[in-house]
Design a protein with these regions (language model features):
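Recognition helix of helix-turn-helix/homeodomain-like DNA-binding domains
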Residues: 35-53
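Residue-level recognition of specific faces of alpha-helices
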Residues: 15, 44-47, 73
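DNA major-groove recognition helix of helix-turn-helix/homeodomain DNA-binding modules
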Residues: 52, 56-73
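Short alpha-helical "recognition helix" segments of helix-turn-helix
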Residues: 30-34
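Short, charged recognition helix plus adjacent turn
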Residues: 1-6, 65, 75-96
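A short, Lys/Arg-rich alpha-helix, primarily the initiator
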Residues: 1-23
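Short alpha-helical elements of helix-turn-helix
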Residues: 14, 28, 42-43, 57-60
Length: 96
């Protein structure tokens, strides 16, 4: 059985940077919101935003929670983030 890596979303790093900027957070502030246990170093945010490192699924879920958006909005290159974000937990099941 051959395993293929899934393609990285082309707009992911831009969207991650956009979330931080729209919410008006520094990298350190964002780390505290993403990882309250403080195991993540703030330099990791820069690596995500520059596309040098791909965030884990748990980190992407935390970004979505902090921004108040659905995970699909982050990883779907056909979806643009709104210019204003709720910045709180939003959960409404999506119909497919």
């Amino acid at each position: 059985m051959e395993h293929r890596r899934r393609p990285r979303p082309a707009n992911l790093s831009r969207k991650l940077r956009q979330i931080r900027q729209v919410l008006g957070l520094s990298q350190s502030e964002l780390v505290r919101r993403l990882d309250p246990s403080e195991t993540m170093h703030y330099s990791r945010i820069s690596e995500f935003e520059l596309g040098r490192r791909e965030p884990s699924l748990l980190t992407l879920l935390a970004y979505a929670r902090v921004a108040g958006i659905h995970l699909e909005d982050l990883v779907d290159d056909n979806v643009e983030l709104p210019s204003q974000l709720p910045g709180k937990v939003v959960y409404t099941p999506r119909r497919r």
